[in-house]
Structures are given as structure tokens and as C-alpha cells.
Regions:
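Small-residue-rich anion-binding loops in enzyme active sites
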Residues: 1-35
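Domain-scale recognition of functional cores that engage charged ligands
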Residues: 2, 10-18, 39-380, 388-401, ...
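Primarily single-stranded nucleic-acid-binding OB-fold modules
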Residues: 346-372, 381-385, 396-402, 406-512
Length: 512
């Protein structure tokens, strides 16, 4: 049998911290696949998406400002291990092409706007060092590929091998900034606690950790002075124990040339383990590439504070109700009020057939879990997940962020629900990680293991199947209390390709 473990396989499992039971569970997932989720509806206004009035927004902002003064620990959590290589896919293709001058729209746009790039002067110096000519001279001499090689190659700026967080994104008179630096500044504007500390945690890949540490060491003093606060920056790496086994198309072990098993990173869902080790009351989560220059930050900061204010208000009500339930003899009216809070405020529709003697236990179980409030933007056709009301195993219906692969696209009704969804997930979360007694939740307990993904890849010219764990904001938070809030599109400005840096939202105010 091609899934029998050899002695060296068991040694590898032990090194990685993966049990044989976990391995067997992964193999079962390949054999059985993952079920599609049963949809109730796409989330919409009055159906799971909050649209707070201006007056309500002010009340939530005040709630957050008050919370900041009360000594709670707040952390910003930024997944930053992704390599930037996908940003440069079109430029790598240009270097390999059998033509030497820009042909595609993307290539032409890149060279047309190159002078606007935040890394332009660095690239110019690099070209002078490598070729003894500046960018202008190289372009006049039709040496377009040499300019790209100076940007991407290890002998040049090495942008093709660095993580996104370390590339220059935005221009300022006193020095251009990377996304890491933008996150420091942004965090100082909504997550500075009463102790004047700004806590930010970056998840990074092992090979880049030193580069991140160096950037922080070089820049901390400057930004602490600007922000009038102490920067407390920490890092972690995805754990080897969250890697997943690769298999052949027949679900046998995929073995490498030396006969060893192949394990692959389990995707961003693995970061639930990193998040679980964060000691904080409130955690802001945002992707590394979704940052804007200072003149656009006020709107981002406003909505971050709004999400946080909604979260702490909901959390305080939840804690109040849990304490009432602790008192045992809750009145019928109180039980009714708690049920209404769960259904109306936490957007969780309870099953109709709960036995009366079980109701208090069900209400307690629904209340006593991690909580998140997520911003949602208008859907303009971006690839990625969206907000839905979904049936749970216990018959309840709650809010989830789903990817297209979790939805049965062969079912016309479900496909239409996905395609006609009004909102898109920009990865803009504020999370509460402790219970009403101040004890941290054990986050892996709230993952739905049936929400992973199977993807098809290749290695050394051979096809393989890979397993992605339930996504961090998808199935990994499936059993959290979840609330969605409409936020404007201006708060969502990711950089997916190098040309995105030429968009107005990433250019200096006076160059727009």
C-alpha cells in the first residue's frame, strides 16, 4: 500500500510535530473531499450587513476611545509571509519572452509609469552600478529587460525574491515607505493603548525574518518619535506542525526524488495557531499589502475604530448576558431577551426545535465563543471570498466568509447567490479572543475541519494534490460569533501586481 509509513517517514513526522492520527485525517480528506456548504443567503443590508448611521458611528467611536483608556491589551496582527513573486509574474514573463520591447498592455504601462515608482531612485542607482547607465539611457537604448533584471534579480534590488512587506510602496519627502512601515504608522492611529504602546505582530517566513527585524531596528526610533509611543514589534513563523501532506492523483503518498514524503505549507489557515499564541484582548487583522499613504489614512482609521467600537459594545453585552446565565434562575423574559440578542445583534438564527430544558445551555454555548467584526466592501468583481449566511451542523444559521470553492457552482441557485453577492471580503477584521472571565479561548477548538481545500499542483514535472487548511478568516473562524459591517471601497487598496502601485491611491497626493 502506497500510504504505508516507513521508518524515515515516522522520523520526519516526529521532527515536524505531526501525529500519525493527523496524517491519517489528512489522507481521509483527500479520499473523501470536502463538502460544499449549505447556503441560506448572501449577506446584504438588513440580512447580516450592518450600515450604522452617522449618529450610531459616533457612539461606537466613543466606545472604542473609552476602551483604549481602560488598560486592555490591543495588538495588530499582520500576515506578512507571502512572497512578492506573484506581483511580478508579468515582468518575469517579459524577461522570458522572445521579444525585447514591451508588447502587452501591462508591459507598456509599467515602462510608461516607471518614473512614478517609489523605488525609482533606488532602481536608477542599481542600473548605474550594474550597467554604468541610468534608466533613461537604458530605455533609450531599448534595454528594457536589463531594467527589469535590475529590479527583480538577486544582483539588483532582488524584488523578485523579497516578501511584499519589504518593498517600497509609497513616496514621502522625508523617505519612502514599505508596507511594514505603513502598518506601524496606521497602528499608532487606532491601536495605541493607555500605556502608550503600539503592539504589532507580523507573521513572516523564516528566510526573511532577519530582514524584517533589521528594518524594524533601523526605523523604530524614527517612528516612535513621530507617534509619541513605544513600538512593541513581534514576529512568528508558520509552524511545521501545520504543514500538510502531498499526495498523487491516486491519493498515494507523493514521494520526492530521494524517497522522502513531501509536506507543503497549509495556507493562511495555519496562522490560527500563531493567533492562538497572541496574548491580547482585541486583535486587528489586516493583510500586509492593504495600505495607503498618510493623506488617505483618516478614512481607514475611522472605519477601523468603528469596527472595534461595535466589537467592544457587542462583547460587553455578551459578557453581561453570560453573567446573568451564571445566576441560574433566569426569568423567561431574560431568556427571551438573550435569544433575541443572539438572533438580531449576533446574526445567528437558532433552530426552532430546541427543547426548553436545553435552551439555557444552547444560549450559553452560542454566547461563550470568540467574536469578530469584519468590514465588507461593495463587490466590484474582485476575485476572492464574500459574506454569506450559512447553515451550521446544529441547524443554526450564522455569518461566514466563503470562497468560491466552498460553494456548489453546479447548482444554478447557489452559483447565482455567489455571483450576485453585493459584498466582498477585504480582510478587515477586529477580533476578541478572551471570554467573560478574562480567560483566552483556545482558537483551534473553533475551527471547522470540514472546510479545507484541495488544490492541484506540480513538482519536478509530476502532478500532485495539496491540502489547504480551513482559511484563517474562513473555516478557521467558522464557529466564532461574527458580525459584518459595510465599509467604503477606499479602505481596500491591495497591491496584487507591481502596476497597482501606479494607481492614484498609492501615489502622493499632489501627483494624483
Amino acid at each position: 500500500m502506497a500510504t504505508t509509513l516507513q521508518v524515515k517517514d515516522k522520523m520526519l513526522l516526529s521532527q515536524k510535530g505531526i501525529s500519525e492520527e493527523k496524517l491519517e485525517s489528512q489522507l481521509q480528506s483527500f479520499r473523501n473531499g470536502f463538502p460544499f456548504l449549505k447556503l441560506y443567503a448572501a449577506a446584504a443590508p438588513k440580512k447580516g450587513i450592518l450600515q450604522p448611521s452617522n449618529e450610531a458611528q459616533q457612539a461606537f467611536l466613543s466606545a472604542w476611545q473609552k476602551y483604549l483608556t481602560e488598560g486592555h491589551k490591543i495588538i495588530k496582527f499582520v500576515p506578512a509571509s507571502g512572497a512578492a513573486s506573484r506581483m511580478f509574474k508579468d515582468l518575469f514573463a517579459f524577461c522570458d519572452a522572445d521579444y525585447d520591447t514591451p508588447q502587452t498592455h501591462f508591459e507598456q504601462a509599467f515602462f510608461h509609469d516607471l518614473h512614478k515608482a517609489p523605488y525609482y531612485s533606488l532602481l536608477n542607482e542599481t542600473c548605474l552600478r550594474l550597467y554604468s547607465q541610468d534608466i533613461t539611457a537604458l530605455l533609450q537604448g531599448k534595454r528594457f529587460k536589463d531594467v527589469v533584471r535590475a529590479l527583480l534579480g538577486a544582483e539588483g534590488l532582488n524584488y523578485g525574491n523579497l516578501p511584499k512587506g519589504l518593498l517600497l510602496f509609497h513616496q514621502y519627502p522625508n523617505g519612502n515607505r514599505t508596507p511594514v512601515e505603513e502598518h506601524l504608522i496606521e497602528g499608532g492611529q487606532y491601536a495605541k493603548g493607555a500605556d502608550e504602546k503600539i503592539n504589532i505582530h507580523f507573521t513572516v517566513s523564516p528566510e526573511h525574518r532577519e530582514l524584517f527585524s533589521k528594518l524594524i531596528a533601523d526605523k523604530s526610533a524614527q517612528y516612535e518619535k513621530e507617534l509619541q509611543a513605544k513600538l512593541c514589534i513581534s514576529f512568528s513563523e508558520q509552524k511545521g506542525s501545520t504543514d500538510t501532506i502531498a499526495v498523487t492523483e491516486d491519493n498515494d503518498f507523493f514521494r520526492q526524488a530521494d524517497g522522502s514524503l513531501l509536506f507543503r505549507p497549509g495556507g493562511h489557515g495555519a496562522l490560527i495557531e500563531n493567533l492562538n499564541e497572541i496574548d491580547a484582548d482585541i486583535v486587528f487583522i489586516k493583510n500586509i499589502d492593504n495600505v495607503v499613504p498618510d493623506y488617505l489614512k483618516p478614512e481607514t482609521v475611522h472605519y477601523k475604530q468603528l469596527l472595534a467600537g461595535i466589537l467592544v459594545e457587542l462583547q460587553q453585552k455578551t459578557f453581561h448576558y453570560l453573567r446573568l446565565l451564571d445566576e441560574k434562575n433566569c426569568s423567561t423574559d431574560t431568556i427571551k431577551e438573550i435569544k433575541q440578542f443572539i438572533e438580531k445583534d449576533l446574526c445567528c438564527i437558532l433552530p426552532q426545535d430546541i427543547a426548553e430544558q436545553d435552551l439555557v445551555a444552547v444560549l450559553r454555548e452560542k454566547l461563550n465563543r470568540p467574536m469578530r467584526v469584519c468590514g465588507m466592501v461593495a463587490n466590484e468583481g474582485e476575485p476572492g471570498g464574500g459574506p454569506f449566511l450559512v447553515y451550521n451542523a446544529d441547524g443554526s444559521i450564522s455569518l461566514q466568509i466563503l470562497e468560491s470553492s466552498q460553494i456548489d457552482m453546479n447548482n444554478p441557485e447557489k452559483k447565482a447567490m455567489f455571483e450576485e453577492g453585493l459584498y466582498f471580503n477585504p480582510v478587515d477584521l477586529v477580533c476578541a479572543l478572551k471570554d467573560y472571565k478574562g480567560k483566552p479561548f483556545n482558537l483551534p477548538d473553533y475551527v471547522d475541519p470540514a472546510t479545507g481545500f484541495i488544490t492541484h499542483k506540480s513538482k519536478d514535472g509530476k502532478q500532485l494534490k495539496a491540502l489547504e487548511l480551513p482559511g484563517l478568516w474562513n473555516g478557521a473562524m467558522s464557529n466564532w460569533n461574527t458580525v459584518f459591517v459595510e465599509v467604503p471601497l477606499i479602505t481596500f487598496n491591495p497591491v496584487k501586481t507591481i502596476n497597482d502601485l501606479f494607481r492614484p491611491q498609492h501615489q502622493p497626493a499632489d501627483d494624483r
